[in-house]
Amino acid sequence: MDEMVLSTQKWLNKKYSNVTGFDKVPENGRTGWPTIYGLIEGLQVELG
């Protein structure tokens, strides 16, 4: 488990959980596709 990855996962879920269509990221501290998809979805929200 990576503490920085876990911190990012928690941040993603806190910031974007109220956005329609955002899939919650598992908070396990592991890198992987769900985390990458969460980062992409967050970026898309920010870019409009």
Identify the function of each model-found stretch.
Residues 1-48:
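Cell-envelope/ECM-targeting effectors and their regulatory/trafficking segments
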